[in-house]
């Protein structure tokens, strides 16, 4: 956080608790306390930024490791013949940028692939993997993603069934669990590591990831920097791209569904600030002027969509969690009364203020050994056990679990959820309210993230002017991180030590050479 912002917010919050004006604090008093905290090492000051010590250490160590990897000599592989054979056998024709992304993965030990939905990222990954298998039959490959749903989707789309979550692949718990952990973990044995949805990775997770990569391993980071940034501290993916030291390939040609996907085109338009969207059966807008009316329309549309496609393929995504009839929590209660009404007390269980029923659609809200935060499933039974109620859950094939009452605190109803919670997931159909009441939350990246969760159909319900407002609002709140600047600083230091020309110096040499 910026020093000035921190001091102003601290002064405001503290003085709100002091009813007598004469006793209220002055700005200089807050500044003096902050300076004392800096001198004691309770916070870290870098330029105009104030860090918690652990966050500064994470940013600094991650920057140092990335810079060392960028300076580390990479042995470019000659893949031309293998690549041509793979393309022929897979029956794919790569665009020039897709081919550049494949080559970058073999010319550098760290590279980035970005692009909106439908631009062929999956085809590139499948090609990279197949080339690698041909070049290194005994090489170890690891695919990872921040969420369970994203890792399973990665496995399905690439045909590589060993994709894991970053937490699982790195053997992590939560950041809170990590505070007391002192044992240094061994580097991963993988020779090629591909991480999808990297825009979701925060500073803590990035620190853990880069600390576990062995020398010589190739890393490919894949993601969409125009989606919402990570929930936790940092803006890692954007900083890696903007530092201009990591090779980045931007895929911008739409391929999905033979170029017939309105979702892919409209995602591109929204990203460009263009309000002239295409509408049709797979991208619909239904007008509604208020939350109560919108909620009725959402419920009606939801019932129609689940009848057509199945309840596990349709998701309502709301900008708001709890405020108003079109918020995720209130929609959950209303929809449940329609699609899964009360039958008997034996089929219900109350956990605090939450009530769950047999056949409810639910979401896991915490990582465990068997399920990940954001995983969706259904309640299959509620029964009496020796030590209280037992609840049977179905999270998909091979992931049928039984929870105790204590475990149930990590579940939410999930007929509807927030756009933030949907990050890393995909659904056949997405239904999304867009109302004036949601204006405070609606920015271009939130809208873009919501519609790009859908594979086949988007249904927007609300006010057109709110949709246009969201498309035009691109004032993304700045995250005060210096990761990119620190990568640049360490890279220059390591490059000079190794006698490697810096990028700008290399450009000057080429210019002088004619």
Where are these regions (language model features)?
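C-terminal accessory regions
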Residues: 375-514
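N-terminal pre-P-loop "Q-motif" helix
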Residues: 92-107
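Pre-Walker A (Motif I) flank of P-loop NTPase domains
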Residues: 107-113
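Conserved helicase motor core of SF1/SF2 NTP-dependent helicases
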Residues: 112, 123, 127, 131, ...
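P-loop (Walker A) phosphate-binding loop of NTP-binding proteins
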Residues: 105, 116, 146, 319
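Conserved glycine(s) of the Walker
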Residues: 120
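Conserved helicase motor core of P-loop NTPases
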Residues: 225-370, 380-382, 511-512
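Interdomain "pre-motor" coupling segment immediately N-terminal to P-loop NTPase/helicase cores
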Residues: 16, 21-78
